[in-house]
């Protein structure tokens, strides 16, 4: 029986910042948030912080976001390694074209023992979950049989690596959308804010909304000055959403 894969979002990379020594400026932040402020001040050469209302990094970045000067957010980035995500969810995720992706290849990686992701509404209902599991098990059994027969059919063609790829790329057609995938996603701060605004909404599919919320929690830990304006709240059904009073791109 297929195992249910839990969603996991792991931070694997983030921006570091080194201020040029010939610029007389200091900040109370580091990393990506400091880079955002530096880029913004570089536009106006406001190194002396003439406006006391934007003298700290947090107030400066908040002002940048509030007035919609989003381009300076593009200099800093974060990378996540995401597992426990369904193939159907990544079909939605990769529509965000400002992200960079590296995803598990079903041509190179056999899916005989792949885990699955149970959709919301099914995962907490024993009868529906049993039906779901039976369907995914049947798909995986068909995949395994197709794979074995295709490998036998192609036994005298090309190299062993080529034969495996050809067999897997054909057999994968019967795998369900619920098949777990694994993906590295890199995006700049502007792209992440857009993703959160779009996908942490109550109008988004619940699986990708969960992903957006988990990413947001880790983004707040990395750069609270840039992401803490988003507030996470629970809906009546127990799922979570995130909204911001500041300017966002949708």
Swiss-Prot record:
What residues sit in the active site? 199 (involved in ionization of n3 of dump, leading to its activation)
Q: What pathway, per the record? A: Pyrimidine metabolism; dTTP biosynthesis
According to the record, cofactor stoichiometry and binding are noted as: Binds 4 FAD per tetramer. Each FAD binding site is formed by three monomers.
- Residue ranges for motif ThyX motif? 95-105
Main EC class of this protein? Answer: transferase
Q: What is an annotated GO biological process for this record, any one? A: dTMP biosynthetic process
- Keywords tagged on the record: FAD, Flavoprotein, Methyltransferase, NADP, Nucleotide biosynthesis, Transferase
Q: Which GO terms describe its molecular function?
A: flavin adenine dinucleotide binding; NADPH binding; thymidylate synthase (FAD) activity; thymidylate synthase activity
Q: Which residues bind FAD?
A: 71, 95-97, 103, 188-190, 194
Tell me which Pfam families the record gives: Thy1 (PF02511)
Q: Which residues bind dUMP?
A: 92-95, 103-107, 172, 199
Q: Which CDD domains match?
A: ThyX
The coenzyme or cofactor needed here is:
FAD
Q: Which reaction does it catalyse?
A: dUMP + (6R)-5,10-methylene-5,6,7,8-tetrahydrofolate + NADPH + H(+) = dTMP + (6S)-5,6,7,8-tetrahydrofolate + NADP(+)
Q: Which InterPro entries match?
A: Thymidylate_synthase_ThyX (IPR003669), Thymidylate_synthase_ThyX_sf (IPR036098)
* Subunit structure and binding partners: Homotetramer.
Please state which protein family the record places this protein in: Belongs to the thymidylate synthase ThyX family.
Which purpose does this protein serve, as stated in its record?
Answer: Catalyzes the reductive methylation of 2'-deoxyuridine-5'-monophosphate (dUMP) to 2'-deoxythymidine-5'-monophosphate (dTMP) while utilizing 5,10-methylenetetrahydrofolate (mTHF) as the methyl donor, and NADPH and FADH(2) as the reductant.
Record's protein name:
Flavin-dependent thymidylate synthase
Per the UniProt record, the source organism is Mycolicibacterium gilvum (strain PYR-GCK) (Mycobacterium gilvum (strain PYR-GCK))
